[in-house]
């Protein structure tokens, strides 16, 4: 058992050094939106309901590319508006004895929220834009009803925070590069909750590889953890 743990630790250490950019990316229409949501959405039920969701432009591109009701012109307009930005959606609520929700006000969420970004080596604090860009405001207004139909009251009470995804030489948060986003929230009494961690690269954006045993290999893996065989 000790040797197995040592081997797994070695696999994980090597995996952290994998260059995802060398692997084949999926076309937007082939991205599994549900799988991508699983990688970018985190939920805690500590003293209520707490949900945080990082939404990159790739999410919208994948969603719109699969929607036959959206024209090419409308799709381009939306994606051009979103390009250069990502979003974080947060909803927090107390849950009553009968299952009723009492949602946190936006100010309370902002007060208890802390965002940190890692490049795989160091962490740095980041912050959302103080104001929503003009072009994005109409889009955010229609997201509430859409999420409400999909998630009920939780979706209707989502709070959206916009991040400027542009930086010199690339993107602030790239779902294709090694790193992590840490989202820390607090409850309504000010107690810090266990942070949410979203790790990159996102496996859902890549054409899957398979280990010899047929199990899927995460995009960050260099070798298969079950038998140590090298992945292509």
Predicted regions and their residues:
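Conserved functional micro-motifs across diverse proteins
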Residues: 21-220, 225-232
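Bacterial N-terminal signal peptides
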Residues: 8-17
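Bacterial N-terminal signal peptides that target proteins for export
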Residues: 1-8
């Amino acid at each position: 058992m000790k040797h197995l743990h040592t081997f797994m630790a070695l696999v994980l250490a090597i995996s952290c050094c994998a260059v995802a950019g060398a692997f084949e990316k999926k076309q937007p229409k082939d991205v599994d939106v549900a799988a991508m949501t699983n990688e970018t959405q985190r939920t805690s039920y500590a003293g209520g309901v707490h949900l945080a969701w990082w939404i990159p432009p790739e999410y919208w591109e994948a969603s719109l590319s699969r929607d036959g009701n959206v024209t090419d012109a409308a799709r381009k307009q939306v994606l051009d508006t979103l390009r250069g930005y990502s979003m974080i959606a947060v909803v927090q609520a107390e849950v009553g004895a009968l299952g009723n929700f009492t949602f946190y006000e936006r100010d309370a969420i902002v007060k208890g929220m802390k965002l940190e970004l890692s490049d795989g080596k160091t962490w740095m604090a980041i912050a959302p834009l103080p104001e929503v860009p003009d072009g994005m405001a109409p889009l955010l207004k229609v997201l509430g009803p859409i999420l409400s139909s999909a998630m009920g009251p939780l979706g209707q009470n989502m709070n959206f925070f916009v991040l400027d995804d542009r930086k010199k030489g690339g993107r602030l948060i790239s779902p294709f590069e090694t790193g992590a986003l840490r989202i820390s929230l607090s409850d309504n009494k000010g107690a810090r909750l266990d942070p949410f961690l979203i790790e990159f690269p996102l496996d859902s954006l890549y054409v899957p590889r398979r280990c010899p045993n047929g199990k899927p290999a995460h995009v960050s893996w260099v070798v298969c953890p079950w038998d140590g065989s090298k992945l292509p």
